[in-house]
């Protein structure tokens, strides 16, 4: 299939394998969920009654005081006591096979093409790391909210865009399924598009 170039005459030919697949919502959901789960820190922790400091001595004798029986001041029933079912650090990551991941990326790229959310440009470079220059460039392309994927990550481009909300600049190797679906548009250079096509072929 051919994709039109924005801001220039001509088209770029891409493989149907990577850019003309049926949308598989269930697969995309599974891969995105797995990606977000893997990003969780999973470091929350609470102490059980045996881990809270103190409470080794029985606070009062078993019988005769008239008070309810107690064996430790760190019981979950007591203030400053342990937690009954204490949370512990855990790994939230979910396994996704490489074949599934690639298939999900193909279906996401294909859906971007179908929804006209993929903008292809010949190249994208700035003369200086100035935010004003970057905003002007985006205005030319009529883009406000976008993931920008470049084959050769230009320092000027990265520095000019890093302070702008709703814009992210990546190279082709560091894109992920969440970033692809999070923005209104995906602006990609021809070189980056070829790298993506090669990775998903």
From Swiss-Prot:
It comes from the Bacteria. Gene3D superfamilies: 3.40.1370.10. InterPro entries: Ribosomal_uL4, Ribosomal_uL4-like, Ribosomal_uL4_dom_sf. GO terms for cellular component: ribonucleoprotein complex; ribosome. GO terms for biological process: translation. Residues 39-67 are annotated as: Disordered. Keywords: Ribonucleoprotein, Ribosomal protein, RNA-binding, rRNA-binding. One of its GO terms (molecular function) is structural constituent of ribosome. It holds the Pfam family Ribosomal_L4. HAMAP family: Ribosomal_uL4_B. Part of the 50S ribosomal subunit. One of the primary rRNA binding proteins, this protein initially binds near the 5'-end of the 23S rRNA. It is important during the early stages of 50S assembly. It makes multiple contacts with different domains of the 23S rRNA in the assembled 50S subunit and ribosome. PANTHER family: 50S RIBOSOMAL PROTEIN L4, LARGE RIBOSOMAL SUBUNIT PROTEIN UL4M. Belongs to the universal ribosomal protein uL4 family. This is Large ribosomal subunit protein uL4. It comes from Marinomonas sp. (strain MWYL1).
